[in-house]
């Protein structure tokens, strides 16, 4: 395959950074364009030190700026689109999430078609498939079962509609007369070093004398390590550029998991952090049905108060369902079509993540020492 170039959106994010680090090792790669709204100084420094023959260009721009996206897509062979806003607690306005996740994706598709970019890979999420009820069990689900989220909450809804737009665009005619090939990847809950969710959970526990909040003890999920998610995107980029493989991949979506044991969210948090003395809260907690109805009551109160006061409940029905469902998926289709095999084992992923948690614990201790002086 001849020399090629790749644009990665959300390149300063949790998954985006890992994709960039792997991408620069790809053969025949001439240029990587890393796009994000703003890059942290440490990310800029890290990217500038990458050992690669490929040119690494950092672009700071808005996914809602259609003209900027057109310029960013010029001369690009593959777009890997990871940029999105993730919000389960309804902190952000609904329209903001829809604009970034859906309109931003539509803008990027249009820019890619205008610039004749032949391959587009969308980083979707398992949340587009549900879970819709904590009472329903899905274990080792598969793509052909057609699970779909029915939630109107802005995050799963916007990601679902964006994924549909990407897959519907497959086969579109490019400006140069070529054909656009697209696919979408649906990772499970992603963990690993620098993960925002995990970071917040650990910091909250450190502020609570090392006690981890119990939020998802009824769940059975199969989390996936961030390095394996990034690897799946690399394989998708290879596949869409390979005429033989592309025929099976284009227009398809894939669940991305790995060999991390099926477990509850709480057990995962405990396993990754117990080396540093963190432990699960052993106090009594509400039964799941009661917790769900409490969430429903709080959402009703929030709705009734909306004309007068912006009350945001501490949790909602979607979050309770998401955190407490039996909801796992197989990666066999990705294995078959993309040649995907997890690059990082569970043991290695656990060790790397635990070591990173150790740095958070140390930083917290230093902060406490500074405050006590």
UniProtKB/Swiss-Prot annotation:
Q: Which GO terms describe its molecular function?
A: 3-beta-hydroxy-Delta5-steroid dehydrogenase (NAD+) activity; oxidoreductase activity, acting on the CH-OH group of donors, NAD or NADP as acceptor; steroid Delta-isomerase activity
An example GO CC term for this entry is: intracellular membrane-bounded organelle
Residues annotated as binding NAD(+): 159
Note the topology in the membrane. Answer: Single-pass membrane protein
The membrane-spanning stretches of this chain are 288-308
Tell me which tissues or organs this protein is expressed in: Adrenal glands, testes and ovaries.
Q: What is its EC number?
A: 1.1.1.145, 5.3.3.1
* InterPro entries, alphabetized: 3Beta_OHSteriod_DH/Estase (IPR002225), Lipid_A_modif_metabolic_enz (IPR050177), NAD(P)-bd_dom_sf (IPR036291)
Q: In which pathway does it act?
A: Lipid metabolism; steroid biosynthesis
Cross-referenced Pfam families = 3Beta_HSD
Q: Name one GO biological process term.
A: C21-steroid hormone metabolic process
Q: Report the principal subcellular site.
A: endoplasmic reticulum
Q: Which domain of life is it from?
A: Eukaryota
Compartment annotation: Endoplasmic reticulum membrane; Mitochondrion membrane
- Catalytic residues (positions): 155
The record lists the catalysed reaction(s) as: a 3beta-hydroxy-Delta(5)-steroid + NAD(+) = a 3-oxo-Delta(5)-steroid + NADH + H(+); a 3-oxo-Delta(5)-steroid = a 3-oxo-Delta(4)-steroid
Record keywords, A-Z: Endoplasmic reticulum, Isomerase, Membrane, Mitochondrion, Multifunctional enzyme, NAD, Oxidoreductase, Steroidogenesis, Transmembrane, Transmembrane helix
What protein family does this chain belong to? Belongs to the 3-beta-HSD family.
Q: What does this protein do?
A: 3-beta-HSD is a bifunctional enzyme, that catalyzes the oxidative conversion of Delta(5)-ene-3-beta-hydroxy steroid, and the oxidative conversion of ketosteroids. The 3-beta-HSD enzymatic system plays a crucial role in the biosynthesis of all classes of hormonal steroids.
The protein's name is 3 beta-hydroxysteroid dehydrogenase/Delta 5-->4-isomerase type 2
**Gene from which the chain derives:** Hsd3b
């Amino acid at each position: 395959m001849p020399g090629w170039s790749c644009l990665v959106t959300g390149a300063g994010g949790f998954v985006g950074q890992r994709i960039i680090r792997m991408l620069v090792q790809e053969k025949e790669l001439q240029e990587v364009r890393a796009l994000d709204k703003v890059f942290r100084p440490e990310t800029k420094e890290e990217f500038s030190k990458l050992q690669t023959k490929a040119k690494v260009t950092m672009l700071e721009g808005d996914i809602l700026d259609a003209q900027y996206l057109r310029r960013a897509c010029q001369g690009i062979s593959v777009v890997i689109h990871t940029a999105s806003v993730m919000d389960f607690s309804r902190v952000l306005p609904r329209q903001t999430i829809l604009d970034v996740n859906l309109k931003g994706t539509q803008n990027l598709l249009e820019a890619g078609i205008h610039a004749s970019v032949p391959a587009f890979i969308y980083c979707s999420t398992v949340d587009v498939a549900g879970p819709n009820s904590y009472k329903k069990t899905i274990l080792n689900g598969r793509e052909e079962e057609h699970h779909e989220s029915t939630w109107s909450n802005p995050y799963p809804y916007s990601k679902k509609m964006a994924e549909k737009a990407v897959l519907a665009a497959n086969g579109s005619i490019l400006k140069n007369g070529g054909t656009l090939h697209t696919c979408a990847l649906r990772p499970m809950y992603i963990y690993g070093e620098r993960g925002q969710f995990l970071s917040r959970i650990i910091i909250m526990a450190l502020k609570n004398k090392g006690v981890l909040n119990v939020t998802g003890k009824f769940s059975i999920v199969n989390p996936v390590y961030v390095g394996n998610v990034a690897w799946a995107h690399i394989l998708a980029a290879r596949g869409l550029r390979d005429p033989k493989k592309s025929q099976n991949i284009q227009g398809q979506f894939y669940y991305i998991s790995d060999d991390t044991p099926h477990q509850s969210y709480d057990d995962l948090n405990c396993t990754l952090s117990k080396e540093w003395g963190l432990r699960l809260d052993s106090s009594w907690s509400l039964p799941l049905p009661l917790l769900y109805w409490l969430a429903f009551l709080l959402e009703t109160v929030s709705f009734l108060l909306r004309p007068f006061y912006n009350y945001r409940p501490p949790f909602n029905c979607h979050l309770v369902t998401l955190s407490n469902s039996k909801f796992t998926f197989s990666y066999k289709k990705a294995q078959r079509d993309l040649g995907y095999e997890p690059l990082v084992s569970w043991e290695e992923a656990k060790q790397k993540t635990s070591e990173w948690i150790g740095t958070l614990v140390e930083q917290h201790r230093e902060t406490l020492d500074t405050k006590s002086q």
